[in-house]
Regions:
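Acidic/His-enriched low-complexity segments
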Residues: 1-139
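Hydrophobic alpha-helical and helix-loop surface patches within well-folded domains
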Residues: 71, 104-257
Length: 257
């Protein structure tokens, strides 16, 4: 995706069937079970930043106004979860003391957003602590988000987050997406669905994690209100679309709802 001075990939497409899009930018066996580690070499102008999955291990000065960043993902991950973003980003950094180690927190934001990052991501450490307590140590290298113009996507170490969510306030809407994408680190990224027909499990677990976290912090009334909305939607709409399916091999056009 190109947008002004920014270029990035998104690992899934809502309207693509199947949804996984590793094959759109590198040769691969683009299924959910053929996992691999990655080395990425990104050559960019000196005044730009790259953000990819894994860790930035080295930057080479090419002597011609460009540099090459070397990113390494040591964990084996599915093809749709590897990613890159390049642009006129400003990097905001923090750390979170996890169960086993200190984990970097990175946010790659546009220059006009950087002053809004800290307030927007106020609860990020609380999300990480909650999920680690419930599901075990954070399984990847860093907690990292990059501002993009199109949607949200749980790439390993490089979550695409809609720039419209970086508002300078910690609110329910931004917290929902920040925590939702983080929870995929355990459900979707570490443990991945076996095929496209079961991709709804990735989203189902992440939706559960949202409700689990918010119920813990806002109480049972929040949970019952949210579940009530979902039940109302089912009662009001599913009969019109015959919207019922067995809980496996779901049609791909309803993976995301």
């Amino acid at each position: 995706h190109w947008s002004d001075d920014y270029v990035y990939n998104l690992g899934v497409g809502f309207d693509s069937q199947p949804h996984n899009l590793g094959k759109t930018w590198f040769p691969c066996v683009d299924n959910f079970t053929d996992k691999a580690s990655y080395d990425l070499y990104i050559t960019i102008p000196n005044d730009m930043l790259s953000s990819c999955g894994g860790l930035l291990t080295e930057t080479y000065n090419n002597g011609n106004g460009t540099k090459t960043d070397h990113w390494v993902v040591n964990q084996e991950i599915s093809t749709y979860l590897i990613s890159f973003a390049i642009g006129n980003f400003v990097l905001w950094e923090d750390t979170y003391q996890g169960l086993e180690r200190e984990i970097p927190i990175n946010v790659y934001a546009k220059p006009n957003q950087i002053d809004k990052v800290e307030a927007t991501f106020t609860n990020t450490k609380a999300f990480a602590a909650f999920f680690e307590d419930k599901f075990g140590p954070y399984p990847f290298n860093r907690i990292s988000y990059v501002s993009t113009n199109l949607g949200c996507m749980e790439h390993v170490d490089n979550v695409a987050l809609s720039s419209s969510l970086i508002t300078g306030t910690s609110n329910m809407n931004s917290d929902f997406f920040i925590s939702h994408e983080m929870s995929h680190s355990w459900f979707g990224n570490k443990v991945t669905c076996a095929n496209a027909g079961e991709m709804w499990l990735n989203e189902g677990f992440a939706t559960f994690c949202n409700n689990y976290y918010f119920t813990e912090f806002y109480g049972d009334d929040f949970y019952f209100e949210e579940m009530g909305k979902r039940i109302d939607d089912i009662i009001m709409s599913c009969h019109a679309t015959e919207g019922w399916h067995p809980l496996n091999a779901l049609p791909l056009d309803i993976t995301y709802g």
